[in-house]
Each structure stands twice: as structure tokens, then as C-alpha cells.
């Protein structure tokens, strides 16, 4: 009785909200509302490159496969199997035959895969071309078989595209055009579109056509944007949301000792860093970059602002990632004396340089306090810092387009580090840092051509060492994610910070 009353209360509350927007919910629905600090800006599955939206689109439209973080292995989704042929330059995917589109249409075909790739590569709004930097073309062999041909042998193709490359219907695009993502957002994933409002919510509902049945999983998932941490915690305690993500350490005490909520902490594969773009002065001088890296007292920030809820990084690889064995010996340690010496060598013995440092506020755990602390640390060794904290959407757009010289940010879903490191540090892949180093480029290419896992990891560790030495970014920590969860919800202990909703249980 009590459990059904709780579910009814969820349903009644959200039904009132959604009736206002033309999307009523049934009282018997298992409705799970989860907070979001990330971008909720578009329904177009190719117009954004953000971790949370990738998770949504993969579960609505379907991806060829995804990374199972618990198994640390790639598993199929729309594809039932894949093989490497043609001396490592072709990945052949075989699609499942037991799927139907959420509007009752046919299952996914090779033509849909080719269409989706063409959308990414030719649509002017696409933000995902970097996913296919290694791809020459994609060819339909038959209805169920598709070949992805790479420019050179590429061992990391699944890491490049699994969980991110959403497959959309060629048939619906031909009938309804590009705007069909608003009017006919139908796919083959375990959930389907229900409702959307920019910077407010994204709502998905179970797809009854999905073959695998999980009756305890939520029928409806509501992503509700809440950037203020106090608001997230209050909403959880009031049962307005059932999962409050990114609870800052200083608010954990509000959740302790409550029988109706629980704290679910987990390690993270999101790497937090400060970027220094070598395309902008004074960051074109490696001595200035390393001076800034030595100025940051990472351990003090972890203890005082994060209250120990973070794992320090020496370089870009951490304990929850593939290929990690130990930190990079070349990583800059806190050493303000060394920072001042490097600035003097670079011509700033009498003060300066003047820099603008950018950060979000409310996107990451305690990001305002952390960015203020970093700015003060830079000033203490001689930098003249102006701290800029624009709205997250504006900052993210500027970073993606290479317009921010120095910033504090995170990169999520870095289980296999090759993709994220290539995205930020390989020449021509994206302009986010505008770092270019032929030696590092060669290592990335060598890693892609290496199919033996340990040999590939050894090459990626060389990349990590070179980045730590050259300091286009100072890698700081991976957060220990703190989730506040209602006691009737079983939340997976997943280092991605996101959820595969069929794995969530509501009682």
C-alpha cells in the first residue's frame, strides 16, 4: 500500500505539471525525476556533443553499442555483433532483427546507419564530426550489414562512436525533413520521447516495443534542470525529485540520518582540468603554462572545498579508466617558487602576465568556489587574473569553437581515454584547446593502429606523459560523485554519472 501511494504521489504531482504542457502521465506510472546541471538545449540528436544528451539519445534512438562501465566492456545495442576485417581498416556491424521503431515502424537497417553518418558529416548544425575523424566512409553491405571503413587501421572505433552515435531513421527524414526530430522523434531504443522544454526538462518514456522487459525500471524519466545545489537537495528532501545528482560535499550533512533518502557515492571517469590554449598569448609559451600548473594547490582544494570527495590526477589518466597504472611522473606538482621562476624565465619577472580565466557556475561541483581559489593561486605567483563566469551555455559554445584561452572544465565519459584525449589534444580534431604537437599526433595514430590492448595502453600512457610535460592543460582530479537518492530507488554505482534506465529499480 505504502509503495503504491508513493508511486501515485509521483504520478499525481507530475501529471499536474505535464497536463499544463499537453503531455499527461498516468497515475500508475513509475515516474523518476532526476536533476540535471548539464545542457538541455536541443532535441536534435546531432546538434550537441554533451554527455547527458548522448545518454538520452542513445536510449531513445539507439546506438550501435555502448560501454558497460561495470564490465569495462563494449556491449551491443542495435548491433548484435561486429568484426574487424580488411587488415584492420573495416569494422563490420551486423544489426539486430528483433527491434521495432517506437512508432511501430520497421527495425534499424544499414541504410539508417549510413543516413545518420551523413547527417553528422553534412548538417551545418552538427557538433559531432570529430567522432568520425578516423572514418573514410560507411557503406551498406545489405539490409542488416554495414561496414565502417577507416582511413587507417583503427582499434578505437568502438570507443569513438559507441554510446554517442545515435542512429536515426532514413525513412522518417525523407518524409519529414530535418525538422522531423521535433515532430517524429522515433527510434529503436528502450525509451522514447515524451516531452521537452529548453533549459527546463527532457522527458522520456519506456518504449513498449523494446524486447527486454524490466518492470521495476521507471516508466517515465524526467530530467529536470537544476543548477543550484541547494535547490537540488531541497527538491530531493521534498520528494519533488527522486535523484539529486552532484550534491556538493558541504551539503551531504543535510541528507545524513534521513530514513527516506540515502547517499550513493561513486568514483568518476570525468576528468577535471584547467586548459591553457597555446594558440593564445601568453599560453603559447610552455613556461607560462607550466608556471600556472605549478601554481595550483590541487590537494588543498580537494581537502578544503571538496572535503576529500575527489581522486587526484597526475596527468589525464585515473584509477577508473582503461590503461591506468600510475600517475605521470612529468605531471606538475604544487610549487609556487618554481612557478615564479618559470614566469621570470618567460619575461615576467616584474609581474604579469595578464590573463582571463573562465569557469562555469553551477555546472560542476563547487565550480564557482574552485575557480575563485584557482584564480587566487595564479595571482599569488604573479599572474594578473580576471575571472569570467558566463552562463554555461555561452561558455560551452565558446569552448567548442575555440574562443576561450584558459578555463576550468570537465570531460565526462573518459573510460577509454583515447577518444577524449584525441578530441582535445590531437591536431585538427576539435578547436577546444588548439594544441598541436606532431609527436603527440604520431602517438595517437600509432595507438589507433595497435589492436593488442596492452601495447595500445602503453602508447596512450606515453601520450599522457607528453601532455603532462607540455602542459596544454593541468589535470586536477576526478570527482567522487555524490548522489542523493530516495530510499525506494536503487541507483547504479556508475562512474559515468549517468544511468542506463533499465538498470534502475523503483520499489
Task: Name every feature range the model reports, one short phrase each.
Residues 9, 94, 128-172, 195:
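Surface-exposed binding/hinge segments that line
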Residues 38-54, 77-79, 105-106, 128-129, ...:
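A structural "hinge/loop" feature
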Residues 68-70, 162-216, 220, 230, ...:
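Gly/Pro-rich hinge or "lid" segments in bacterial periplasmic/extracellular proteins
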Residues 179, 208-254, 376, 384-386:
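Ligand-site clamp/hinge motif
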Residues 283, 312-346, 363-369:
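Structural transition elements
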Amino acid at each position: 500500500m505504502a509503495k503504491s501511494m508513493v508511486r501515485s504521489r509521483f504520478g499525481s504531482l507530475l501529471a499536474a505539471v505535464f497536463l499544463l504542457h499537453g503531455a499527461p502521465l498516468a497515475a500508475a506510472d513509475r515516474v523518476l525525476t532526476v536533476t540535471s546541471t548539464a545542457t538541455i538545449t536541443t532535441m536534435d540528436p546531432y546538434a550537441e556533443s554533451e554527455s547527458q544528451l548522448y545518454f538520452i539519445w542513445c536510449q531513445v534512438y539507439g546506438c550501435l553499442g555502448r560501454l558497460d562501465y561495470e564490465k569495462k566492456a563494449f556491449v551491443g545495442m542495435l548491433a548484435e555483433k561486429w568484426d574487424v576485417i580488411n587488415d584492420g581498416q573495416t569494422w563490420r556491424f551486423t544489426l539486430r532483427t528483433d527491434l521495432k521503431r517506437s512508432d511501430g515502424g520497421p527495425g534499424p537497417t544499414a541504410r539508417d546507419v549510413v543516413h545518420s553518418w551523413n547527417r553528422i558529416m553534412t548538417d551545418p548544425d552538427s557538433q559531432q564530426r570529430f567522432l568520425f575523424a578516423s572514418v573514410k566512409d560507411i557503406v551498406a553491405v545489405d539490409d542488416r550489414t554495414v561496414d565502417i571503413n577507416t582511413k587507417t587501421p583503427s582499434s578505437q572505433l568502438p570507443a569513438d562512436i559507441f554510446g554517442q552515435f545515435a542512429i536515426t531513421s532514413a525513412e522518417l527524414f525523407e518524409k519529414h525533413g530535418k525538422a522531423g526530430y521535433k515532430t517524429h522523434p522515433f527510434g529503436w531504443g528502450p525509451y522514447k520521447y515524451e516531452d521537452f522544454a529548453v533549459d527546463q526538462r527532457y522527458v522520456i518514456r519506456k518504449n513498449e516495443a523494446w524486447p527486454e522487459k524490466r518492470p521495476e525500471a521507471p516508466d517515465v524519466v524526467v530530467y529536470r534542470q537544476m543548477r543550484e545545489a541547494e535547490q537540488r537537495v531541497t527538491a530531493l528532501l521534498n520528494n519533488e525529485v527522486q535523484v539529486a545528482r552532484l550534491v556538493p560535499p558541504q551539503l551531504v550533512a543535510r541528507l545524513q540520518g534521513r530514513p527516506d533518502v540515502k547517499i550513493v557515492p561513486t568514483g568518476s571517469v570525468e576528468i577535471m582540468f584547467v586548459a591553457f590554449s597555446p594558440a593564445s598569448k601568453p599560453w603559447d609559451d610552455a613556461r607560462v603554462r607550466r608556471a600556472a600548473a605549478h601554481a595550483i594547490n590541487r590537494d588543498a582544494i580537494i581537502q578544503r572545498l571538496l572535503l576529500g570527495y575527489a581522486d587526484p590526477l597526475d596527468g589525464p589518466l585515473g584509477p577508473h579508466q582503461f590503461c591506468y597504472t600510475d600517475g605521470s611522473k612529468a605531471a606538475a606538482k604544487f610549487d609556487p617558487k618554481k612557478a615564479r621562476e618559470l614566469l621570470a624565465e618567460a619575461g615576467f619577472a616584474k609581474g604579469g602576465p595578464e590573463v582571463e580565466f573562465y569557469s562555469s557556475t553551477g555546472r560542476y561541483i563547487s565550480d564557482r568556489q574552485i575557480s575563485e581559489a584557482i584564480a587566487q593561486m595564479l595571482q599569488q605567483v604573479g599572474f594578473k587574473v580576471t575571472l569570467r563566469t558566463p552562463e554555461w551555455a555561452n561558455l560551452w559554445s565558446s569552448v567548442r569553437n575555440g574562443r576561450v584561452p584558459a578555463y576550468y572544465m570537465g570531460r565526462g565519459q573518459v573510460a577509454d581515454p583515447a577518444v577524449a584525449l584525441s578530441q582535445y589534444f590531437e591536431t585538427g580534431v576539435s578547436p577546444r584547446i588548439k594544441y598541436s604537437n606532431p609527436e603527440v599526433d604520431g602517438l595517437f595514430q600509432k595507438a589507433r593502429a595497435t589492436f593488442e590492448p596492452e601495447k595500445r595502453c602503453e602508447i596512450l600512457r606515453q601520450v599522457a606523459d607528453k601532455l603532462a610535460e607540455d602542459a596544454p592543460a593541468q589535470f586536477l582530479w576526478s570527482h567522487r560523485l555524490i548522489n542523493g537518492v530516495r530510499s525506494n530507488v536503487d541507483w547504479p554505482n556508475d562512474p559515468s554519472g549517468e544511468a542506463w534506465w533499465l538498470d534502475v529499480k523503483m520499489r
